[in-house]
């Protein structure tokens, strides 16, 4: 538990173990009383504020005292002060302005003053605290605690505010306003603390780096590097908070903040900064915090060690006021000792580094390097290798943390990691990139299992605990010459960081051979590409060097023609054991980032760990995608950062299945800017085309489509089929870019679990690069500088390229990737809000496209950089490679577009057939598709012709509203798609892959003659401009539209249409923007326009598919208005069972809102549809091309039906390549599409109904459980006639809504009436019960008086019985008693308890928790605590005469008795409850007390212990209560038998005279005014005549009260 090596820990532990040192005072958690701690902390705070910490009156310093029974109570002076409001007025006067202070005269004035400041005094149950609560005589402590909390909050608000925090943080850090802006004070505190801790991380990282550089020298580099590494291991861990109370309880974060502001007073070495702190460490830190506060901050720490350590939630206001005070001291007061640390301290160091980096490199001979690689013994030194410059070999080192501001000048102005509270500071990105992910405590994304043990990580290290995120982990690429790592395993290159939403550092993608046939073979020759990877971990630091000169054995099928110089890429994975490995290669053979030594972990084959085990180990953020294939698919992405490229340089590496021999001269760094990466987003994958050594069809297209990745939440890696490979399915590389993406990625990860190709996303974190290397890289990779700032990738992803091509050329709604790309292509260069705001702000992410940079453009941007050195040459040639890839990718995208068009055509025909089927049920003859005029006429009869104007008004409103909603909703849905796409592309078997390939060929052939034009990529630029205009227009109209929408709904008249019933769900229009393409004037009337089956987004939240505004298109005269989806359910994918919406065949598909997309200029209305193929749990998402009309004309109905049905049955989910819809997502269609269940085509008799789902008719049989749905457009040339029908449908819908609303209102009224009746009935019952109770009490009283009179007469010889003048019991006890005859039992409420308790006997526990405990004197727990609250008369008048003595009986013996009452018995005490302890107490302390009676008492108690009866009765001689005998009472039989003593053997009902109850706390018996025995009776007397006349010689007359 305790790290003895840590000074703080050891010291703290000593204190805890040695009681004399004071640590024994620590209250264990199980005995820690949070309620008491709250009272103590609040009283200490308010007294300190009222009087000054050093001037608190002596009697107020400790507010508690312990009474004789060792119970803790609040001192009367404190209670008096609280009740008098003096403390509150004093403290409140310190906050208020001068003239307001005079008005503070009492509790109410303080409450009002606080409320004027927006702070309301509320108890924990949200009831407002009133003046009466605060001045109530038995103090109500909960109200006073709420008052003190409100004053603390007022103080907090005075000292800290969100604005102040933001202003403070801006001085030393940067952040994303859209993601990280605090939303309340607590969040602001967490924000401030985290930012300071991140700043400290940066500073310490820079210091470590500076020391490294200064210590290094060519002669002693290795030794010094090693030594520095060892010292760096001790580097402190600066924690980041997620929860203020939970994460801040160890004091480490606050001490780090104090150190930042007061480095001289709080030395960093004095603070115990560990990732996992023990209790001793925490205690040490808290003591340190308290000492600092007492010495420098005016003793503002008002908590105990336990308060801070256990951090109960009730103390949150106290902790917050302390943090606010810290902030106030450091940011407002700023005493002399406050001197914040800053980067300024490192400027001199930076200058030194610059000078050093400008020196010529020190050449190191190949022989020297080989010497380190030659023997394992050299491993220890090899990993100490210094930064080596190898200019001639093109081995570009990358420094992954640019420090200089100019690095960030090009479009990287503000990084915006999606995760909040992560560092976005430009100038410190270098040092915190490794830390901003691990900073989420205990969720470290560092190079450990988070993903660093990717699901196929070459090393499974179950024995290793997760890497502390505290380590400043400089990760570099490491080459393992000893080949300890299995090169063929997917985790040989364990990419140590998943693409996570907060990743700011470079990402690494590695597709490594997952299933090489002979893994050990490559290990033996040590030349496999992946055998270059040595995953090392020396004291939790990583260095990885990629060796590029490895020549795989030609016999190894996995590396058919891999170039000897193919650049390998590895990610850093932590290895489990501390083995060292030689890690240097020849000068031209590795990329080195030698920041810290690393230790080689054993190869995976040495460990008996299955892939499943490894996968199970991965942390939530790790992402590993695998695809089944014959051989592993190679993809290595490497990031090499130029001086300004923010680690955006990629080196593609040919590998295994794709035989690409890339000459070393051609493999250079390719700068691919991925905005998403700058923002912690997607990977950028450099694509490369195979050279003649490999088939031209081979190759990975690993593209970074920035627009795609940022918003879509994933990246496509499409691999084109190579002749020697057996599959060509696209890979889906997922990344997470938002909070909600985590789940998607995790699920996708599970989906890919069993598949073969590992696609490991990672990013270097904490990579430290010497300034010398940085300087070198400036020259070598300068060509990447200008456009490597994180804009859209020049190398589009297959999907994005395809999308943009098809979007530009054919107005086809390909995929939302394409739309998103178009929307981003034109953006400003600054990336600050592109990623961070994607999920939060409606417009920033969508209207902020980044410019599209092609490889050619990129080449032109920095022509002067090419040819200056081999590195530039390599890069320029790789640029050419990428340009070739671009062409190839365009061809593939065109093919995909054709496939989508084919699918759209099939869907069109299928939908048409379904519509025919539906219509035939309404018409006797089997005719061609029913013309829309039929419906138009029918509806016009019902609706009249007068509704057109109103509808046309509504149409414009709704279209605009849809556009607005699209903008609002799209960013939120972006992240939902990654899992969907992953599922969609998860090929179940090779057959599906072949089927996909065959489909591609077929679709290409089919569409070659039907699609009249080739995709023109250049149209993207035009659409981009128009898109931006559209978006800006829509943004301006948002506010107006929201008002117009409501007006629209009110204006629409309703016309009843018989025979139809509409859905009545009342929803707002939240539809995304839909644009419908211009219709071809030559469209055949009998054919509908091909539907665009758009993107069903895999939105777990159930949002509809987001549809983009591709661009404005002029339309011809044939343009007709097309209604968009209904107002009701567009945004909500709500399933409507078919059975719930019976429809007549006369209104199929017309039940839609009439909102033509129609401004006269005509925007293309893109409608999204989801076709849910339930058999595959996939979605076919198809997009229509702009030639869809032609397609629909040329394909016969039969062909379409056959093709569609066949397609639905097959695994053709890859056709659309983008979206999928979860299984449970209801089928939804939009606008003028008809959605028809395919099962109805195959089984027409199954369901004869049409179910209207807002924009269309869905034919669904028994709910949504259908394998497929077809869609088709209605012919737009008949739109005018259909418009009338749709108007009618719209009005019908309005009418139905009104009817539904009316019915709903009636139901609500009925429910309210029922509730009222119930309340009246209960009130009547209560009244009757009270009357009965009153009558019964009166009866009892009369009986009692009568018997008392009779008793006086009978006992004349004995004298009048004394009425035992007992002092009334405290009201608190009084509240808990019960009438023995009442038969009722009600528990006392906390309020009554605290209201009636007197201050002197107030128990702390009962005051703090308002629970009726510990009010019994002597600390004896009450065995029978009940309440008299149900008998208000009896329970509220303790000062009655003797006839009410029984009322004051103690709660300790107040079981309800069952009286001789014939009315309803509310409660019967179970007879199993025993009164043995009470009788024991009575005999010991009352009946036989004293030394004289001790022998007798002992004998009686012995008998009592021997007996196992439940209930006992004491027999008294008479009203004088002289003890005579002890009896056992059996309530079931109501028999009373003598146990011991003097008296009759048994007592019957008739013998009983009086009944008594014993009060344990007052040690006396009280007479009960009842005649009937019950278990609540403790003693009794029998009639006097039953006693023998002989009196005992020495009667023992016990005192009734001791």
From Swiss-Prot:
Location (main, coarse): cytoplasm
Biased composition (Basic and acidic residues): 603-620, 772-789, 857-869, 1103-1114, 1301-1346
CDD domains, alphabetized: UDM1_RNF168
Domain CKK residues, every copy: 1463-1597
Subcellular location: Cytoplasm, Cytoskeleton
Compositional bias segments (type: Low complexity): 797-808, 830-841, 1206-1220, 1393-1410
Region feature Disordered, mapped onto this chain: 426-471, 603-637, 772-808, 825-870, 1075-1165, 1206-1226, 1301-1448
Residue pairs linked by disulfide bridges in the UniProt entry: none
Chain positions with Phosphotyrosine modification: 1537
GO biological process entries: cytoskeleton organization; microtubule cytoskeleton organization; neuron projection development; regulation of cell morphogenesis; regulation of microtubule polymerization
Pfam families: CAMSAP_CC1, CAMSAP_CH, CAMSAP_CKK
Keyword field: Coiled coil, Cytoplasm, Cytoskeleton, Disease variant, Intellectual disability, Lissencephaly, Microtubule, Phosphoprotein
Coiled coil: 873-909, 1016-1048, 1291-1343
Keyword Ligase appears in the UniProt entry: no
GO CC terms of this entry: cytoplasm; microtubule
GO molecular function: calmodulin binding; microtubule binding; microtubule minus-end binding; spectrin binding
Disease entry from the Swiss-Prot or TrEMBL record: Cortical dysplasia, complex, with other brain malformations 12: An autosomal recessive disorder of aberrant neuronal migration during brain development. CDCBM12 is characterized by severe to profound neurodevelopmental delay, microcephaly, cortical visual impairment, craniofacial dysmorphism, and seizures. Brain imaging shows lissencephaly, severe hypoplasia or absence of the corpus callosum, cerebellar hypodysplasia, and dysplasia of the basal ganglia, hippocampus and midbrain.
Role summary: Key microtubule-organizing protein that specifically binds the minus-end of non-centrosomal microtubules and regulates their dynamics and organization. Specifically recognizes growing microtubule minus-ends and stabilizes microtubules. Acts on free microtubule minus-ends that are not capped by microtubule-nucleating proteins or other factors and protects microtubule minus-ends from depolymerization.
Family: Belongs to the CAMSAP1 family.
Protein name: Calmodulin-regulated spectrin-associated protein 1
Species assigned in the record: Homo sapiens (Human)
């Amino acid at each position: 538990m305790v790290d003895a090596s840590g000074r703080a820990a050891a010291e703290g532990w000593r204190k805890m173990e040695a009681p004399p040192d004071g640590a024994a005072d620590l209250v264990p958690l199980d005995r820690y009383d949070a309620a008491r701690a709250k009272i103590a902390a609040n009283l200490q705070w308010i007294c300190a504020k009222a009087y000054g910490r050093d001037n608190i009156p002596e009697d107020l310093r400790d507010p508690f005292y312990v009474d004789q029974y060792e119970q803790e109570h609040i001192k009367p002076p404190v209670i008096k002060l609280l009740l008098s409001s003096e403390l509150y007025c004093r403290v409140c006067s310190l906050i208020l302005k001068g003239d307001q202070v005079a008005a503070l005269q009492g509790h109410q004035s303080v409450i009002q003053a606080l409320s004027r400041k927006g702070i309301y005094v509320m108890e924990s149950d949200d009831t407002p605290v009133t003046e009466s609560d605060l001045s109530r005589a038995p103090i109500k402590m909960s109200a006073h605690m709420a008052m003190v909390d409100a004053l603390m909050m007022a103080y907090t608000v005075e000292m800290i505010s969100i604005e102040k925090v933001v202003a403070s943080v801006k001085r030393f850090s940067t952040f994303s306003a859209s993601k990280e802006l605090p939303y309340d004070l607590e969040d602001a505190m967490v924000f401030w603390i985290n930012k300071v801790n991140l700043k400290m991380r940066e500073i310490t990282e820079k210091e470590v780096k500076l020391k490294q550089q200064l210590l290094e020298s060519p002669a002693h580099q290795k030794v010094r590097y090693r030594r520095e590494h060892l010292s760096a291991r001790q580097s402190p861990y600066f924690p980041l908070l997620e929860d203020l109370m939970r994460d801040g309880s160890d004091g480490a974060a606050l001490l780090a903040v104090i150190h930042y502001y007061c480095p001289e007073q709080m030395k960093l070495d004095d603070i115990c900064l560990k990732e996992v702190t023990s209790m001793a460490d925490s205690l040490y830190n808290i003591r340190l915090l308290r000492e600092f506060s007492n010495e420098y901050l005016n003793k503002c720490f008002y908590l105990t060690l336990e308060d801070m350590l256990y951090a109960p939630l009730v103390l949150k206001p106290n902790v917050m006021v302390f943090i606010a005070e810290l902030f106030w001291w450091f940011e407002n007061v700023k005493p002399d000792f406050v001197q914040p640390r800053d980067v300024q301290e490192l400027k001199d160091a930076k200058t030194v580094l610059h000078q050093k980096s400008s020196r010529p490199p020190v050449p190191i001979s190949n022989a020297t390097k080989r010497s380190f690689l030659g023997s394992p013994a050299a491993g220890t030194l090899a990993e100490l290798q210094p930064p080596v410059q190898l200019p001639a070999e093109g081995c570009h080192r990358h420094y992954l943390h640019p420090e200089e501001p100019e690095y960030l000048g090009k479009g990287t102005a503000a990084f915006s990691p999606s995760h909040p509270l992560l560092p976005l500071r430009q100038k410190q990105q270098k040092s915190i990139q490794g830390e901003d992910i691990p900073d989420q405590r205990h969720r470290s994304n560092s190079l450990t299992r988070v993903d660093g043990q990717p699901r196929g990580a070459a090393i499974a290290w179950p024995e290793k605990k997760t890497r502390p995120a505290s380590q400043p982990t400089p990760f570099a690429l490491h080459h393992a010459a000893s080949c300890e790592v299995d090169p063929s395993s997917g985790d040989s290159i364990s990419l140590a960081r998943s693409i996570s939403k907060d990743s700011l550092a470079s990402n690494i993608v590695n597709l490594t051979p997952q299933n090489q046939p002979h893994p050990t073979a490559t290990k033996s020759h040590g030349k496999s590409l992946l055998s270059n990877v040595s995953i090392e971990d020396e004291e939790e630091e990583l260095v990885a060097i990629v060796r590029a000169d490895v020549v795989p054995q030609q016999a190894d099928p996995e590396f058919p023609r891999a170039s000897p110089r193919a650049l390998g890429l590895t990610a850093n994975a932590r290895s489990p054991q501390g083995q060292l490995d030689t890690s240097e290669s020849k000068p031209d053979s590795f990329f080195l980032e030698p920041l810290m030594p690393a230790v080689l972990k054993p190869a995976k084959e040495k460990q008996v760990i299955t892939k499943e085990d490894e996968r199970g180990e991965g942390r939530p953020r790790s992402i590993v995608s695998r695809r089944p294939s014959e051989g592993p698919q190679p993809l290595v992405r490497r990031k090499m950062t130029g001086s300004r490229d923010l680690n955006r340089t990629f080196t593609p590496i040919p590998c295994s299945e794709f035989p690409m021999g890339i000459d070393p001269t051609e493999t250079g760094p390719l700068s691919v800017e991925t905005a998403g990466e700058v923002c912690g987003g997607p990977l950028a994958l450099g694509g490369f085309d195979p050279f003649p050594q490999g088939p031209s069809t081979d190759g990975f297209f690993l593209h970074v489509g920035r627009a795609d990745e940022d918003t879509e939440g994933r990246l496509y890696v499409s691999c084109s089929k190579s002749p020697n490979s057996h599959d060509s399915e696209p890979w889906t590389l997922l990344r997470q870019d938002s909070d909600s993406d985590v789940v998607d990625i995790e699920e996708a990860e599970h989906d890919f679990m069993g598949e073969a190709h590992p696609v490991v996303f990672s990013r270097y974190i904490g990579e430290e690069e010497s300034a010398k290397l940085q300087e070198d890289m400036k020259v070598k990779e300068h060509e990447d500088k200008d456009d490597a700032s994180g804009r859209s990738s020049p190398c589009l992803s297959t999907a994005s390229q395809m999308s943009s091509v098809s979007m530009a050329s054919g107005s086809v709604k390909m995929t939302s990737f394409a739309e998103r790309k178009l929307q981003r292509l034109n953006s400003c260069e600054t990336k600050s809000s592109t990623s961070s705001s994607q999920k939060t702000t409606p417009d920033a992410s969508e209207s902020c496209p980044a410019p599209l940079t092609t490889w050619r453009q990129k080449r032109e941007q920095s022509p002067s950089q090419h040819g200056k050195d081999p590195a530039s040459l390599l890069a320029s040639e790789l640029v050419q490679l990428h340009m070739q890839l671009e062409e190839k990718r365009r061809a593939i995208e065109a093919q995909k577009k054709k496939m989508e068009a084919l699918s759209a055509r099939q869907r069109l025909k299928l939908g048409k057939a379904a519509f025919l089927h539906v219509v035939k049920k309404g018409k006797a003859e089997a005719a061609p598709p029913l013309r829309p005029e039929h419906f138009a006429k029918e509806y016009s009869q019902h609706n009249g012709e007068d509704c057109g104007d109103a509808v046309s008004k509504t149409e414009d409103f709704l279209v605009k509203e849809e556009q607005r909603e699209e903008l609002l909703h799209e960013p939120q849905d972006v992240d939902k798609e990654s899992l969907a796409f992953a599922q969609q592309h998860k090929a179940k078997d090779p057959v599906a892959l072949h089927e996909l390939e065959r489909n591609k060929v077929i679709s290409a052939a089919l569409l070659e003659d039907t699609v009249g034009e080739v995709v023109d990529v250049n149209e993207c630029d035009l659409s981009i401009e128009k898109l931006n205009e559209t978006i800006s227009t829509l943004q301006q109209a948002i506010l107006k539209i929201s008002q117009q929408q409501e007006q629209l709904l009110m204006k629409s008249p309703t016309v009843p249409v018989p025979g139809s019933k509409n859905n009545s769900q009342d929803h707002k229009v939240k539809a995304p923007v839909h644009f419908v393409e211009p219709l071809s004037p030559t469209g055949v009337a009998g054919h509908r326009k091909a539907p665009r089956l758009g993107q069903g987004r895999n939105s777990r939240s159930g949002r509809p598919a987001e549809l983009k505004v591709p661009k404005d298109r002029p339309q011809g005269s044939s343009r007709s208005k097309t209604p968009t989806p209904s107002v009701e359910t567009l945004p909500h994918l709500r399933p409507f069972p078919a059975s719930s919406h019976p429809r007549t065949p006369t209104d199929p598909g017309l039940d839609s809102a009439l909102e033509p997309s129609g401004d006269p200029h005509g925007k293309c209305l893109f409608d999204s549809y989801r076709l849910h193929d339930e058999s595959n749990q996939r979605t076919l998402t198809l997009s229509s091309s702009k030639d869809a009309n032609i397609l629909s004309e040329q394909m016969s109905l039969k062909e379409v039906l056959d093709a569609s049905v066949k397609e639905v049955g097959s695994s053709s989910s890859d056709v659309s390549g983008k979206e999928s819809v979860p299984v449970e997502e209801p089928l939804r269609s939009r606008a003028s599409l008809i959605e028809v269940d395919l099962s109805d085509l195959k089984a027409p008799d199954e369901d004869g109904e049409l179910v209207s789902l807002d924009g269309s008719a869905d034919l669904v049989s028994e709910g949504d459980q259908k394998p497929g749905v077809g869609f088709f457009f209605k012919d737009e040339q008949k739109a005018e006639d259909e418009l009338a029908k749709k108007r009618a449908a719209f009005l019908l819908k309005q009418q139905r809504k009104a009817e539904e609303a009316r019915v709903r209102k009636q139901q609500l009224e009925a429910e309210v009436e029922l509730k009222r009746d119930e309340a009246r009935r209960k009130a009547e019952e209560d009244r009757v019960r009270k009357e009965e109770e009153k009558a019964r009490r009166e009866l009892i009283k009369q009986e009692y008086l009568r018997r008392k009179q009779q008793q006086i007469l009978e006992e004349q010889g004995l004298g009048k019985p004394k009425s035992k003048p007992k002092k009334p019991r405290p009201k608190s006890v009084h509240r808990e008693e019960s009438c023995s005859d009442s038969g009722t039992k009600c528990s006392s409420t906390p309020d009554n308890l605290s209201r009636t308790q007197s201050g002197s006997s107030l128990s702390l526990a009962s005051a703090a928790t308002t629970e009726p405990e510990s009010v019994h004197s002597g600390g004896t727990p009450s065995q029978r605590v009940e309440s008299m609250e149900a008998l208000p008369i009896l329970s509220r008048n303790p000062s009655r005469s003797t006839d009410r003595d029984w009322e004051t009986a103690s709660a300790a013996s107040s079981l309800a008795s069952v009286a001789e009452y014939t009315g309803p018995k509310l409660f019967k005490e179970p007879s199993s409850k025993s009164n043995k302890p009470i009788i024991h107490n009575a005999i010991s302390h009352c009946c036989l007390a004293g030394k004289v009676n001790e022998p007798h008492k002992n004998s009686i108690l012995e008998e009592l212990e021997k007996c196992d009866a439940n209930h006992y009765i004491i027999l008294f001689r008479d009203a004088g209560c002289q003890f005579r005998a002890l009896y056992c009472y059996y309530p079931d039989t109501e028999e009373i038998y003598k146990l011991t003593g003097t008296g009759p053997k048994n007592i019957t009902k008739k013998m009983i005279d009086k009944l008594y109850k014993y009060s344990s706390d007052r040690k006396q018996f009280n007479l009960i005014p009842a005649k009937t025995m019950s278990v609540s009776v403790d003693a009794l007397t029998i009639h006097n005549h039953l006693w023998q006349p002989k009196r005992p010689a020495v009667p023992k007359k016990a005192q009734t009260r001791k």
